[in-house]
Amino acid sequence: KENLDDGKEKKKEHRFKFKRYKIQEVIKPNQVILVQVIKDERGQKGAALSTFISIAGKYIVLMPNTPKGGGISRKIFNPADRKKIRSILNEIEIPKEMGLIVRTAGSNKTKNEINSDLETLINSWSQIKENAINSIAPSLIHQESEIIKRTLRDMFDENTQNIIVEGNEGYKKAQSFMKTMMPVSYTH
């Protein structure tokens, strides 16, 4: 029976390309690391964390510490769209230490629109890094935008004529977001 168990363990090891480390071998006491919550805690299970940070924009998802260049969402099936996006990705300058994925919302966008989204996300990453440097661990450094900001980011486009927001607080949040993230589109 012991030999059979040894065989199973060897098979498991061959499935993984990389050596699997125990967390105690990788992270030392008092070491400060930047993580992102990828799944909230539920019941008895704690939150799932990742050191592979991703920041969603309107047309792309930026992966600031994953140097893989540009990718395309698997949900974009049309070969012509994929070819056009690949061409755009070859033309824009993606920092070498970063990667990005073009979202489905970016499938019919221009080079300038995708590049503008990239610049916005790079600025967000710079702010996140600055906040991390100036904070004392453990600390919340950045939080995904609330519903108003996410909706504006994902739904607002050149065809949007009016935005109706309920309440003064919601209006102020929407106004602030539009001024900061979409200044060209912003008018009272």
Task: Identify the meaning behind each predicted range.
Residues 1-186:
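Single-stranded RNA-binding surfaces
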